[in-house]
């Protein structure tokens, strides 16, 4: 248990915070929740901790509210820095079997960009390491230069995406640079009789496997051969004496296992790297470890305590457990979660890779890649909230883009600038009795951030074609009410106030002064298509920064993608 004085200090802090929130009276339950969320390992001492909490709450509640506030300001000023518009993120449940430092890892295959599905493991692994003040490791699982061939750029894509999510790693390594280590462990397992070299045709091994050991062992299998004989064959593999497909190293497992994939699974195989060079190490190696062999070796070497992975890896967990038992290692605690499906997007890594190979960029807003979501204006905190909210559940989860947009909108609403934008624009001259000023809030929650647009009699303005119905009365946002004379291309002054607009049920529309217009091209993802929308924004749009996310009135949120000489290019986020 943490030092008693430190524990009492932490309880006192949260008791003060809870008291101030509830008119000077703290309660045991919320304070206890804070303590357990911060230090999950204390759950086993809950009974003793509750006694201390009650004692300290009695002390805190004896203070006046003013005294409580004074105490917080003096000792814990950070508690008063409330994030007004940030919703409280759901707390992950405690990890099982925490004994010392928690060490987690994310082990992506760099054969494509990260998407929402495979980023789940990264976010959960990092958040748990952070929760326990542990260690988070980034390990590139790049040991298949043929079937799941790494893409050289993908290493940087993944690191860029993780940094965008706010994920920091203490160690970075590449499985493709650790082959000598895997060879060392392979030799040991062969020496101990736990592994052997199979030189049979794969069809022969399948017959042997399917017989569950009843079939006489083929001579080419070498399962019963001496360790010395198998070591000699292994050295021949390393020496290039066998071609691809002529020899593999297998782990001895239970021949009666009902799952055929578990029976004597392949630890290492030969890949012709002259034909399929690895993007990092070229053709230096031709004997490559399989995913399961390399993973369990590195999990042990790196001291991984908890592995968070999709339940589709359940079979892999059992395969890796064999090696752990042969080596006498403690097996990491494995937490498995269901698939995460995003409605309206393709989640298949192979399909995404196919699009990339045909020239589609990884940040295409149609894709569920992190780069695509980022370019679309989805905030990293939104992604993290979605993943943490789903949590570690074995059941599959489905998230629609509408869910993501709703969370993103809540985060953007209080801080995003509002800009007037007109698509399908029609130009009209405005007939006014005098010059008028439109004072429009840049951010509604910050009324002091107004901008003033002066409109003089006869000025030309743009409104949307759909709004320009002949003889209709419109309210030009924050300016005045006008009647549409479509034939003469005029907007004729009707009245000034919003109340008068309400009396005639006038539609409130956005508008742009013609002589101040900023040409805008909107890139909008619609299922499998990209739609380009032309329009004009008000003058202030020219001052927007790249990556800034703003709301176009009556259109939606957009992210500034590029600023060309005569065009502002934005990507549509959501309504």
Swiss-Prot record:
The record's keywords, sorted A to Z, are: Aminoacyl-tRNA synthetase, ATP-binding, Cytoplasm, Ligase, Nucleotide-binding, Protein biosynthesis
Motif 'HIGH' region, per the record, lies over 108-118
Compartments reported by the entry = Cytoplasm
Keyword hit for Nucleotide-binding: yes
| Catalytic activity, EC | 6.1.1.17
A single Gene Ontology CC term: cytosol
Q: Which reaction does it catalyse?
A: tRNA(Glu) + L-glutamate + ATP = L-glutamyl-tRNA(Glu) + AMP + diphosphate
Q: What is its main location?
A: cytoplasm
Q: Which domain of life is it from?
A: Archaea
Family, as annotated: Belongs to the class-I aminoacyl-tRNA synthetase family. Glutamate--tRNA ligase type 2 subfamily.
PANTHER family cross-referenced by the UniProt entry: GLUTAMATE--TRNA LIGASE, GLUTAMINE-TRNA LIGASE
Q: What does this protein do?
A: Catalyzes the attachment of glutamate to tRNA(Glu) in a two-step reaction: glutamate is first activated by ATP to form Glu-AMP and then transferred to the acceptor end of tRNA(Glu).
HAMAP family linked to this entry: Glu_tRNA_synth_type2
Which named protein is this? Glutamate--tRNA ligase
- Name the source organism: Saccharolobus solfataricus (strain ATCC 35092 / DSM 1617 / JCM 11322 / P2) (Sulfolobus solfataricus)
The encoding gene: gltX
